[in-house]
Amino acid sequence: MFYRMIENKRNQWLSSPDCTITSLIDYIVKTGQMRDAQIEAIKTYLFLKIACEGKPLATLFKHGAFNTLDLNALELSQSTRDYLISHPSAAALFEYVCMKNDNDEQVSAKLEKAIKKTPDSIDYNKVWNDTFYGVSYTDYLFSLPMGAGKTYLMAAFIYLDLYFAMNEPHNSAFAHNFIIFAPSGLKSSVVPSLKTIQNFNPSWIIPEPAATDIKRMISFEVLDQSKTEKKSNKTKNPNVQKIANHQPLSELFGLVAVTNAEKVILDRIQEKDGQISMFEESDDEKDRQANELRNLIGKLPSLSIFIDEVHHAVSDEIKLRAVVSRWAENQTVNSVIGFSGTPYLEKAEKIKITDDLAVGTAEITNIVYYYPLIDGVGNFLKRPIVKIAEVADSSRIIENGVRLFFDTYKDTVYDGGLVAKLGIYCGTIEKLEEVVYPIVSSIAAEYGISSDAILKFHKGNKQYPQPADGQMQFDILDKSISKIRVVLLVQIGKEGWDCKSLTGIILSQEGDCPKNMVLQTSCRCLRQVVKGTPETALIYLNDTNADKLNAQLMQQHHIWYCQVFFANSFLIK
């Protein structure tokens, strides 16, 4: 709910004479290339950078930067009113605990009463430091659902920072260099992230000639190569070489490095019981090289660190914060900008206010912007039709789902010649080869579709080797040359799979995907193909996966599919 205070103050600023970005926002809207979710995020980003000078959230809340309550209009004792007026950090906490959520539930009536009674009994500075994890650096999190265009939004932030930094090179609010941590759990996410950012057209958000000038300045680096050759302990870390090539680092401007935090930045770091060891005194060559890279990145001036899919890095969060805190000691870190699909924690946390009082929050506290998943449906996401099979037999569910898909989407061809595709998750390679493929190929033949239009995509085992051209066919699914209509998968494509022409998903049994990934897997088919065009997609589930989908929607987005998210859901016998 802290983001609501930020949004309220942002809106006040945008409509005030102090706002300096009105013409820029008008330009972005006029170009028509950015989604509403992205434009609203840009407004918040620039508000925090310009009006709030890019300061850490704890500092801003202590200074009352987001206070909007008219204390003179509230029923307060004169002493309490005077205290809150003269102590903006207290007024900020008071405003927060008085807020109500979408269910009209107040954050904390108890705390409101306590502040009214004895406002000087709370250490407000400590509360705000604890609320935002005690970090000394700027750490903002943007929560947007899948399909909102988070990677393009990163690119927009990069270009906007450089645009303002060129005009005000000594303004510390704007970053000069950037490192992007691609999702830690996705091994193949680094290069696609880089390509998406490289393909971004800065003239969508910045007028010419500045857009082209900045694009020419940017240099890209992928930090993903192996550390050393096996037979050498003297070979230099190639990632270090890539950064060192940009010497002198003190004058560096416009570097965009993309890497996998887990495999590169957090390499050779151990965490035990909250204690971090970076083996800085180690004689081990791999330890030395890992630290060499970290130390060099820590010298990049005015560095903004972008973390994609923050929820992936939960197990590595302590390590990552330790590394960033070490970099921040050099006074080189401009900010940490995170991106996540959900604002909600797995379980609520307590923020201690006094020995007797605490306030619970189910949201990640450093979220500065939140775009609900439900607002994306029918906007930049296809409108899903969810079918829940009453029968338990996996083969029958697949058979019925494939027939329904072909009945509905057999002749669907999107702009650009992309044919609609169905994804079926199979659990095991044996099931894919021995059960699912025969069923699908038989039904496809009935509809006049060749078996060549069925892609078997898995990594292979002793009995069934990896299909020879499987990876190539998978990589071109979203191109007009692909004639694939059905993709059979085993433990691949659960997340980070960006295929807009995917128009249906079948999960026929428990184990087709990890239990905690049913929502992400089901929603793979919801990315919109043509902007502004009403599109639908089929999600066909057995009852177990439907229950998990519902539970994960409730946990991660606080919505229930039969009531709100999926208007077209049916029980199929």
Model-identified regions with their sequence ranges:
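Conserved C-terminal RecA-like helicase domain
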Residues: 58-60, 148, 209-243, 250-258, ...
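Conserved Walker A/P-loop ATP-binding site and its immediately adjacent core
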Residues: 153, 171-213, 262-263, 427-433
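Interdomain helical connector at the RecA1-RecA2 junction of SF1/SF2 helicase-like NTPases
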Residues: 169, 321-323, 327-443
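SF2 helicase catalytic motif II
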Residues: 263-264, 273-331
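Conserved RecA-like P-loop NTPase helicase motor core
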Residues: 460-562
